[in-house]
Amino acid sequence: MDTPETSTPYEQVEKGSFFSFRPQKKRVTYHLDEQVGNYHYGDKHPMKPHRITITNHLVMGYGLHNKMSVFSPRMATFGEMSEFHREDYLDFLKRVTPDNAEQFADKFQQFNIGDDCPVFDGTYEFSQRSAGASLDASRKLVQGQTDIAINWSGGLHHAKRGEASGFCYVNDIVLAILNMLRFFPRVLYIDIDIHHGDGVQQAFYESDRVLTVSFHKYNGDFFPATGNFDENGVKGGKYFALNVPLEDGIGDEQYTSLFKSIIEPTINTFQPSAIVLQCGADSLGYDRLGVFNLSIHAHGECVRFTRSFNIPMLVVGGGGYTLRNVARAWCYETSICVNEQIPSELPRETLYYEFFAPDYTLHPRLTTKIENKNTPKALEDLRIRALEQLRYLGGAPSVQMQQIPPDLTGHLEEEDERLNDEYLDKAVDVRVRG
């Protein structure tokens, strides 16, 4: 039985719409849930899902949607999310609301609910949408329907099996990788968020089929206070977690040089069948929660370099708390994925044009006054240690000896087909909202 379609090309939903699907030679898919940007963590909370809406409008304003296939994914089901997450945790997320939160207060500590991860209207549905888009993107990859799949609403890398963490409730990345492992022998996970990708590392800490590589700020205190070099995996996954702990203020040349000098030998040694690239934009200069000095060009160069290996790739978002720069970065990186050069001058017709005042440019100067504490010697030591760790991998692992993770769709095929039929019947309205 063929795997049922789980997302809808926009031309099937509304022909002639702004988001219409147009087949292109470049096999890039863009997985867009138009509702995911409508959720609100709270007035003073730094996480603003609306950044996804701004990003999408900028992408469309540049006409990049004409260079890729845009899909509207369905939300992830409880069953799909429970392939990684504990059912009691998911049940809590499904039932709790701001109105009844007091009834669940005794569970807050257990599930790490608080200031960082509050209960807001639609917490569960927001997580379903983010996870659903990453799962949909992973399906397109494993079915051979695309070479690069993009979900900017994904990348929520801190969520654990049974608790929320760091603004993340459901780990869409882990769910997508589990699905990909059913078809791809080895998956390389790369994380350029300023925060350590602890949730993904923890999920695959004993596995030699997933190699996690995280470039992040680390001083033993900066959230999540993990990701030192000595965290390198256990049991069968020993040496399959590679951490690159950095100090404040790293700039473009240092970062991109270090990234390339580690990622190239990593790919050559591990020989991944697919790559998941988490593009957290809080590593940019002037981020509200960041302490690096990266430009949008440098951040995008990591995407460009990873793309150059021509390996099937899932690209997701992540952190990023200065909204206009998040949208700029992810739009620019979308242009890299479709191999399209776009001008720095922003398109005037985009709905959020005035949001980018006063410069109205894709590449503002983002260098800050944060002192660069990364010495050339320290970075060279990191590079050498990374190469030494790669030597222990002994080449690509013997996949035949490894257990394949459970089928994310297997026993859910009938439900999946039913949900897809319902989705098509609804003829979802995908008109751009002005």
Curated annotation (Swiss-Prot):
Active-site residues, record numbering mapped to chain: H158
Q: Which UniProt keywords apply?
A: Chromatin regulator, Hydrolase, Nucleus, Repressor, Transcription, Transcription regulation
Q: Which GO terms describe its cellular component?
A: cytoplasm; cytosol; heterochromatin; nucleus; Rpd3L-Expanded complex; Set3 complex
Principal location listed in the UniProt entry: nucleus
Q: Which reaction does it catalyse?
A: N(6)-acetyl-L-lysyl-[histone] + H2O = L-lysyl-[histone] + acetate
Task: Give positions of region: Histone deacetylase.
Answer: 26-339
Q: Where in the cell is it found?
A: Nucleus
Example GO molecular function term? histone H4K16 deacetylase activity, hydrolytic mechanism
GO terms classed as biological process: epigenetic regulation of gene expression; negative regulation of DNA-templated transcription; negative regulation of gene expression, epigenetic
Q: Which domain of life is it from?
A: Eukaryota
What is the E.C. number? 3.5.1.98
Q: Which family does it belong to?
A: Belongs to the histone deacetylase family. HD type 1 subfamily.
Briefly state the protein's biological role.
Answer: Responsible for the deacetylation of lysine residues on the N-terminal part of the core histones (H2A, H2B, H3 and H4). Histone deacetylation plays an important role in transcriptional regulation, cell cycle progression and developmental events. Histone deacetylases act via the formation of large multiprotein complexes. Is not essential.
| Designated name of the protein | Histone deacetylase phd1
Native source organism of the sequence: Schizosaccharomyces pombe (strain 972 / ATCC 24843) (Fission yeast)
